[in-house]
């Protein structure tokens, strides 16, 4: 059964690994296994909601612009305006809102179709280790193919769709959501800072969708309110700090440091899974 200290640790792990490209789903399998505790999907959902609050807190101005752009687009559509010919290029808020929508579509489809099967088949620590190595390879590759300067005004809907597909692959435990989206963005020619910003904002619909699907499981949580609150607050604080850290690092630091980390943890995880 969860206690407050374990909840704080897991909240910190979620907050850090959700935004740094090291796989939150993988770490939420590994850390409870090391601590000898069972959390379940319901507690994971509480932690994901905490990181969602962190995103809203850090990117609140961008989110307001996204909402504004979406509402204006809907108004245009009801008035018969062909937004895809003219308006999306003229109004940045509208264009960015639709870039997020287009990127969310494949993620949602993949999540609905694959999530249950993957969580059943690939939840073990051996698979986490294998997919952490995949994450490491993707990060390492992207650093050597990231010379683009594409920003919001230049990003195509095709590129948004590809990044959304890569985000959908994060249903595999050990595949980093932020890692796959930032890396795919870099390989597509996105500016480093914009690739990270788009990645974080693209995660909002995915986290909300996953939370709505799993909200029914929260009633099954065998933990006190204080334990849940501790995990939630911890994920918010560490999530916010991790976003701030990565947004600074992405400008001048290489993603190789995360690739090396995922490689080391992945190899150790595979060895322990086979030996123990």
Curated annotation (Swiss-Prot):
Subcellular location: Cell membrane
One annotated GO molecular function: undecaprenyl-diphosphatase activity
EC number: 3.6.1.27
Catalysed reactions listed for this entry: di-trans,octa-cis-undecaprenyl diphosphate + H2O = di-trans,octa-cis-undecaprenyl phosphate + phosphate + H(+)
Segment forming the signal sequence: none
Keywords on record: Cell membrane, Hydrolase, Membrane, Transmembrane, Transmembrane helix
TM stretches of this protein: 40-60, 98-118, 121-141, 155-175, 200-220, 227-247, 255-275
InterPro entries listed in its UniProt record: UppP
GO cellular component, one term: plasma membrane
Domain of life: Archaea
Principal subcellular localisation of the protein: membrane
Mode of membrane association: Multi-pass membrane protein
Family according to the record: Belongs to the UppP family.
Role of this protein: Catalyzes the dephosphorylation of undecaprenyl diphosphate (UPP).
Protein name, entry field: Undecaprenyl-diphosphatase
Gene that this sequence comes from: uppP
């Amino acid at each position: 059964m969860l206690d407050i200290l374990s909840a704080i640790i897991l909240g910190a792990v979620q907050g850090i690994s959700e935004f740094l490209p090291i796989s939150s789903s993988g770490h939420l399998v590994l850390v409870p296994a090391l601590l000898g505790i069972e959390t379940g999907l319901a507690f994971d959902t509480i932690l994901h909601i905490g990181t969602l609050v962190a995103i809203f807190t850090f990117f609140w101005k961008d989110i307001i612009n996204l909402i504004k752009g979406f509402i204006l687009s809907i108004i245009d559509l009801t008035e018969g305006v062909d937004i895809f010919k003219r308006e999306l290029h003229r109004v940045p808020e509208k264009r960015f809102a639709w870039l997020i929508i287009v990127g969310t579509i494949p993620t949602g489809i993949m999540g609905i179709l694959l999530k249950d099967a993957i969580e059943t088949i690939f939840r073990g620590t051996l698979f986490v280790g294998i997919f952490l190595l995949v994450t490491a390879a993707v990060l390492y590759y992207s650093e050597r193919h990231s010379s683009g300067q594409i920003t919001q005004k230049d990003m195509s809907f095709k590129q948004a769709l590809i990044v959304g597909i890569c985000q959908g692959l994060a249903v595999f435990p050990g595949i980093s959501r932020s890692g796959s989206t930032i890396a795919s963005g870099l390989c597509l020619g996105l500016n480093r800072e914009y690739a990270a910003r788009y990645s974080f904002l693209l995660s909002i619909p995915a986290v909300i969708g996953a939370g709505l699907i799993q909200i029914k499981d929260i009633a099954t949580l065998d933990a006190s309110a204080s334990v849940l609150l501790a995990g939630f607050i911890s994920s918010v604080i560490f999530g916010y700090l991790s976003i701030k850290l990565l947004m600074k690092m992405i400008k001048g630091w290489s993603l190789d440091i995360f690739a090396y980390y995922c490689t080391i943890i992945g190899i150790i995880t595979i060895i322990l899974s086979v030996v123990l």
